């Protein structure tokens, strides 16, 4: 659980990737401008417009499938078990990270290519994972133990997000995109190992 709450905050770095893509590829600005974008206010505004538009579409493309899938997951997991609800979001995360890595590696791809990362939401995303975790905890624990375990889930959630946010900047600064997205992939792999 700690890994899965930590992982999404590390990928905030993808915003930097999107800004780089839009600046260098979509708008075809000089690399000097893109590396010092805050010093070029007019260029920065143009980049922000395109990035905001792509982010809006990405949010729509990731939210709608996850909402629809999540509506059916609770009853489905009553029949088919809880583990798929823990595994499917991990698969989606791996697909999303793959799209981010491809974007980082293929510097000539436009910013809109990052919209393909929304394919991960077809696996339920964060909502499906939480449904799976809370349902699994309810199935395997009783009384006092259930309360304690649910409190631990909340603790990991509230610690994981700020920790991931705090570490994403230094990891990106010293290791670049591959370090951040690679770490997310490794952590997702560790989740697979624990779930199976």
Label each PLM-derived region with a short phrase:
Residues 58, 116-122, 134-137, 150-156:
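Hydrophobic alpha-helical segments of secondary membrane carriers
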Residues 59, 127, 145-173, 179-181, ...:
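Glycine-rich segments within core transmembrane alpha-helices of 12-TM secondary carriers
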């Amino acid at each position: 659980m700690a890994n899965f709450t930590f992982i999404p905050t590390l990928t905030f770095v993808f915003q930097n990737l999107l800004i780089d893509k839009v600046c260098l590829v979509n708008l075809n600005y000089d690399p000097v401008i893109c590396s010092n974008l805050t010093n070029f206010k007019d260029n920065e505004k143009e980049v922000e417009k395109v990035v905001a538009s792509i982010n809006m579409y990405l949010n729509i493309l990731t939210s709608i499938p996850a909402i629809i899938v999540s509506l059916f997951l609770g009853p489905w997991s009553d029949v088919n078990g809880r583990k798929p609800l823990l595994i499917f979001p991990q698969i989606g995360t791996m697909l999303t990270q793959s799209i981010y890595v491809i974007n980082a590696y293929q510097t000539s791809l436009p910013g809109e290519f990052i919209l393909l990362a929304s394919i991960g939401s077809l696996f339920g995303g964060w909502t499906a994972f939480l449904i799976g975790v809370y349902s699994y905890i309810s199935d395997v624990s009783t009384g006092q133990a259930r309360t304690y375990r649910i409190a631990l889930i909340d603790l990991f959630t509230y610690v994981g997000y700020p920790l991931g946010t705090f570490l994403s900047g230094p990891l990106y600064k010293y290791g670049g995109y591959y370090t951040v997205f690679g770490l997310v992939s490794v952590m997702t792999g560790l989740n697979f190992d624990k779930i199976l």
